[in-house]
Regions:
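Conserved beta-strand-loop-beta-strand hairpin that lines the nucleotide-binding pocket
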Residues: 1-4, 51-134
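Bergerat-fold GHKL ATPase/HATPase_c domain
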Residues: 1-43, 54, 132-134
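Hydrophobic residues in the alpha-helical elements that line and stabilize the ATP-binding pocket
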Residues: 48
């Protein structure tokens, strides 16, 4: 089976985290992840969504790609609100939480978060969560 990508666009509001978690869980189940891996995937998805949501975007786009048992979730935050940027201390805490849930997390800063790349800590499963703002 080849790459299958689903693109979902959500308003950057907490109510939509549940819908994104369910979509990620469905794709994870289809890709053959076990229940613990799906739970971890849902947690990473929530944290990445929260991180971008609170940065001041109006919408968050999530691309979920399944390719023969591996998953990749890419997030893009679009249409920033002016003047609604969180304090750096809150950003540091959120980034630390996301990093603690993953094997590797690289952050690039330029006033706001430019990119967060994290590889899931699931042993044999190849799961990546990417958060980036464009």
């Amino acid at each position: 089976m080849g790459n299958q990508t689903s693109r979902l666009i959500f308003p950057a509001k907490p109510d939509y985290i549940v819908a994104l978690r369910l979509a990620a869980a469905a794709v994870g189940n289809k890709a053959g992840l076990n229940i613990d891996e799906i739970d971890h995937l849902m947690l990473l998805t929530s944290q990445a969504f929260n991180l971008l949501m609170l940065e001041g975007s109006k919408h968050i786009e999530a691309d979920i790609t399944e390719n023969g048992g591996s998953l990749e979730i890419s997030f893009s935050a679009v249409e920033y609100h002016d003047g609604q940027v969180e304090t750096e201390s809150r950003n540091v805490l959120k980034k630390a939480l996301l990093k603690s849930l993953t094997r590797k997390c690289c952050m690039i800063h330029k006033g706001r978060i430019v990119a967060c790349v994290a590889a899931g800590a699931l042993g044999d499963s190849d799961m990546r969560t990417y958060g980036r703002q464009v």
